[in-house]
């Protein structure tokens, strides 16, 4: 008799995605981060749901309600700490997941990759509106500065900003709508994740060698389900460690002060996971130019498949491209460091050099190196 999981209309879908999914034999630990992102998303939605039960989206009580959650709600301090630090882990997994896709040429699955880039933008938007909710100093001023960037849009900019604010400044209407968006967006992300997986399972997973693995596949369960489980344990342990021992390590001290429109913090900066994009934004001394650079720093990922010139898929056997890849990683770290620094010499010029290198790697150096490596293969 055929198992119920193979015949039941609903269970069959889950079975084909999680149990009997043919998976390349040789995928490494870098392929764990997709499932880790799923775990992060579920963790964030569950902790967020419990926080939303006690949070009030009103400027007079928002800050106090967060204090109330930490002091009076059963394990409220833990739920908030996991939610705040879970966002950091979400982005760590996200950046590693994208880096894996770049390194092994997974971006050649066009639909999966492009949906992934849209997911990246949605997660960034969710994190940004969520950061505003505790209504601390950096929350307020971060919201003011970032939403103000839209005023750089020609002709409709100022109207657009007032429309998003719901008034002439970041105020109660802004906080209320940001809470609504922060609650809604994760569910849109879930829908996009399902699409992401749908397109991935049309082609099957890529593998470290970049070769067609169809002749050498094994079922996802029990092999990779157990491997994922180990990843879950490591990540949850690391998250617990951070949330319990250093819950404020990655936060901004300014957020311990309630939002005050009359006092500007000395250095306005976003959370650490946005600093690289913030550095690119600041490296252009023109408002519209900076906004476009900020936008293209993410959208440049969409042109990666178009600019793929190599005859090999991944970077496993392409040492020069590997060197460029690690240069990109180092460049991202430099940009992250610069994003958190004040706008003064020598940080300005370092940020500008790092920004030029960032776009050069994607748009010029990777494609040219691919062509040169093809030539080298012909000569050998």
Curated annotation (Swiss-Prot):
Biological role: Component of the ubiquinol-cytochrome c reductase complex (complex III or cytochrome b-c1 complex) that is part of the mitochondrial respiratory chain. The b-c1 complex mediates electron transfer from ubiquinol to cytochrome c. Contributes to the generation of a proton gradient across the mitochondrial membrane that is then used for ATP synthesis.
Self-association and partners: The cytochrome bc1 complex contains 3 respiratory subunits (MT-CYB, CYC1 and UQCRFS1), 2 core proteins (UQCRC1 and UQCRC2) and probably 6 low-molecular weight proteins.
Record's subcellular location: Mitochondrion inner membrane
GO MF annotations, alphabetized: metal ion binding; ubiquinol-cytochrome-c reductase activity
Stored CDD domains: cytochrome_b_C (cd00290), Cytochrome_b_N (cd00284)
Family: Belongs to the cytochrome b family.
Name of this protein: Cytochrome b
Encoding gene (name): mt-cyb
Note: Heme 1 (or BL or b562) is low-potential and absorbs at about 562 nm, and heme 2 (or BH or b566) is high-potential and absorbs at about 566 nm.
Cofactor binding, per record: Binds 2 heme b groups non-covalently.
Species this protein is from: Danio rerio
Keywords recorded for this protein, A-Z: Electron transport, Heme, Iron, Membrane, Metal-binding, Mitochondrion, Mitochondrion inner membrane, Respiratory chain, Transmembrane, Transmembrane helix, Transport, Ubiquinone
Keyword Mitochondrion: yes
Binding of heme b b566, residues: 97, 196
Record's bilayer topology term: Multi-pass membrane protein
Amino acids binding a ubiquinone: 201
Transmembrane segments: 33-53, 77-98, 113-133, 178-198, 226-246, 288-308, 320-340, 347-367
């Amino acid at each position: 008799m055929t198992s119920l999981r193979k015949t039941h209309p609903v269970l069959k879908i889950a079975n084909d995605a999680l149990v009997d999914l043919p998976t390349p034999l040789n995928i490494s630990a870098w392929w764990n981060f997709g499932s880790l992102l799923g775990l992060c998303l579920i963790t964030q939605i569950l902790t967020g749901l419990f926080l939303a039960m006690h949070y009030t989206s009103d400027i007079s009580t928002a800050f106090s309600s967060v204090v109330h959650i930490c002091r009076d709600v059963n394990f409220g301090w833990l739920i908030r700490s996991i939610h705040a630090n879970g966002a950091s882990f979400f982005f760590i997994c996200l950046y590693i997941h994208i880096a894996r896709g770049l390194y092994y040429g997974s971006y050649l699955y066009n639909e999966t990759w492009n949906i992934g880039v849209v997911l990246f933008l949605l997660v960034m938007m969710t994190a940004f509106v969520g950061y505003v909710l505790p209504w601390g100093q950096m929350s307020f001023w971060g919201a003011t500065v970032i939403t103000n960037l839209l005023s750089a849009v020609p002709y409709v900019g100022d109207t657009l900003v007032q429309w998003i604010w719901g008034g002439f400044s970041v105020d109660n209407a802004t906080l209320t709508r940001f809470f609504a968006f922060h609650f809604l967006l994760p569910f849109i992300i879930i829908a996009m994740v399902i699409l992401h997986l749908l397109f991935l399972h049309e082609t099957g997973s890529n593998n470290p060698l970049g070769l067609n693995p169809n002749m050498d596949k094994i079922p996802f369960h029990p092999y990779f389900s157990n491997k994922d489980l180990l990843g879950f344990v490591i990540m949850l342990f690391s998250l617990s460690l951070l949330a319990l021992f250093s819950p404020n390590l990655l936060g901004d001290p300014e957020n311990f002060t309630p939002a005050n429109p009359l006092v500007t913090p000395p250095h306005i900066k976003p959370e650490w996971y946005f600093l690289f994009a913030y550095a690119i934004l600041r490296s252009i001394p023109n408002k519209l130019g900076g906004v476009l650079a900020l936008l293209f720093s993410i959208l440049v990922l969409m042109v990666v498949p178009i600019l793929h010139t190599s005859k090999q898929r991944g970077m496993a056997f392409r040492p020069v491209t590997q060197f460029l890849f690690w240069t990109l990683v180092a460049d991202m770290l430099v940009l992250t460091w610069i994003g958190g620094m004040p706008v003064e010499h020598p940080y300005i010029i370092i940020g500008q050099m790092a920004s030029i290198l960032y776009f050069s790697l994607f748009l010029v150096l990777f494609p040219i190196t691919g062509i040169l490596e093809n030539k080298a293969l012909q000569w050998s």
